[in-house]
């Protein structure tokens, strides 16, 4: 019998046997507490963030494994800036400012899950998310910073980051 995959979004380090986890894995005959403990251990570094988790279950042996994804870009931006939430009106209400170093740090975390082929392209995706959240980059409108990336203004930072 093929393995079954259950995908859930849980708060890092704070998964509980209640929804969405319990109802999703209970019918598979797993020890829910064991699964919850393993997820909490695997996601403790992402405390306070929503984290995508895959639970891969062998329905015959009841063995399972946990795969932890990287939180959504918006969650990483909020954590980096210590924000509760993004702006309800991103064009009128700015809630924070990212440095280019912070943008690159987030882009490196997310790059494997993005369609971007280069770190520059990944950084531009992060900046796009910042724009939709009401977050400026280097104190400027995120669209302006995306143009500056295309013009090579931050090339030194990208070269340094790619060597790390």
From Swiss-Prot:
The name this protein goes by in its record: Large ribosomal subunit protein uL11
Provide the coiled-coil residue spans.
none
Subunit structure, briefly? Answer: Part of the ribosomal stalk of the 50S ribosomal subunit. Interacts with L10 and the large rRNA to form the base of the stalk. L10 forms an elongated spine to which L12 dimers bind in a sequential fashion forming a multimeric L10(L12)X complex.
A Pfam family hit: Ribosomal_L11_N
Q: Any idea what job this protein has?
A: Forms part of the ribosomal stalk which helps the ribosome interact with GTP-bound translation factors.
Q: Which UniProt keywords apply?
A: Ribonucleoprotein, Ribosomal protein, RNA-binding, rRNA-binding
Cite a GO CC annotation. Answer: large ribosomal subunit
Name the species this protein comes from. Answer: Pyrococcus furiosus (strain ATCC 43587 / DSM 3638 / JCM 8422 / Vc1)
